[in-house]
């Protein structure tokens, strides 16, 4: 998934960086509250320092595991929404679906089955079919 996002960013000459975990995202300037998303896309390079990103990434993807389920669906969802993340995908292998939050649109989340192609709301033309990645 990271490679698809990275290729799309590079192909479209976006001034963004794609970071896989472990990469710290801090939600306050004292750098005490942080998470490590599975994939982060940061387009504002002023948010980057030697420890990670201070402030909200533009786009975050989390892949749910049994141990991270509650954190990904509730805690991180609230943190990302409050911090200003523009788009958040929760990829859930157990349920074979992806929950997509387009926070800028202030709408209910969209649910996409792994067999469906997901279109990014903030990156026109970025499409990912999770089932294709799992083959």
Give residue ranges: language-model regions.
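Gly/Pro/Ser/Thr-rich low-complexity, intrinsically disordered segments predominantly at protein N-termini
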Residues: 1-135
């Amino acid at each position: 998934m990271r490679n698809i996002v990275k290729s799309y960013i590079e192909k479209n000459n976006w001034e963004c960086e794609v970071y896989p975990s472990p990469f710290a995202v801090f939600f306050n300037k004292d750098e005490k509250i942080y998470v490590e998303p599975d994939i982060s896309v940061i387009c504002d390079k002023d948010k980057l320092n030697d420890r990670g990103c201070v402030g909200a990434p533009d786009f975050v993807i989390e892949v749910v595991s049994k141990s991270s389920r509650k954190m990904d669906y509730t805690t991180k969802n609230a943190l990302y929404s409050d911090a200003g993340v523009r788009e958040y995908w929760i990829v859930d292998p157990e349920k074979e679906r992806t929950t997509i939050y387009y926070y800028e649109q202030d709408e209910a989340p969209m649910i996409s089955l792994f067999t469906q192609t997901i279109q990014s709301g903030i990156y026109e033309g970025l499409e990912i079919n999770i089932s294709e990645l799992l083959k």
